[in-house]
């Protein structure tokens, strides 16, 4: 039997600038939003930065020796996650934001966006695969990936969506890279 987990996204947040404060902000966002839970599931222990997060949110855990053993013995065999788009983070004033999803933040000037403000970033998928594998050395499965768009239903019931086909093709090619 193989046990997996579901992570709501990949480590797809880029610093908007090369300012070290932006780099550190992204690192903190990934630790809090992705790695905190993924590390527990895949490594069987709370990460070194967990106490900082607990303090930030006023959490006081009473972790028993039995809890430690349970975590160590309850790790997953594979990582599964959703990937739709990437985001940016910055400590600087933002003039243009991306919208339409939970990853709202500064708009990445190197990416294109769909009509709802989701970034189109197949390289971000490749990056997330690389990061997850480097961190966990476990099989990976992208279980959600797609493109939302306003489609036109033709009279014969078909939808002509070459833009969606191009999106899927680019993301499959990124996985093969």
Indicate where each model-derived feature is located.
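Active-site region of glycoside hydrolase catalytic domains
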Residues: 1-177
């Amino acid at each position: 039997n193989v046990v997996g987990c579901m992570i709501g996204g990949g480590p797809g947040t880029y610093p908007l600038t090369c300012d070290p404060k932006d780099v550190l902000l992204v690192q903190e966002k990934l630790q809090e939003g992705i790695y905190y839970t993924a590390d527990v599931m895949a490594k069987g222990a709370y990460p070194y930065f967990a106490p900082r997060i607990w303090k930030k949110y006023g959490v006081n855990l009473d972790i028993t020796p039995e809890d430690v053993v349970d975590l160590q013995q309850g790790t997953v065999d594979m990582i599964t996650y959703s990937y739709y788009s990437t985001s940016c983070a910055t400590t600087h004033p933002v003039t243009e934001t991306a919208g339409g999803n939970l990853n709202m933040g500064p708009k990445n000037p190197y990416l294109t966006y769909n009509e709802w403000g989701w970034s189109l970033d197949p390289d971000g998928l490749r990056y997330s695969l690389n990061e997850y594998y480097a961190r966990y050395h476990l099989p990976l499965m992208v279980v959600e990936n797609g493109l939302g768009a306003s489609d036109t239903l033709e009279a014969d019931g078909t939808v002509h969506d070459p833009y969606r086909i191009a999106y899927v093709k680019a993301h499959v090619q990124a996985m093969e890279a």
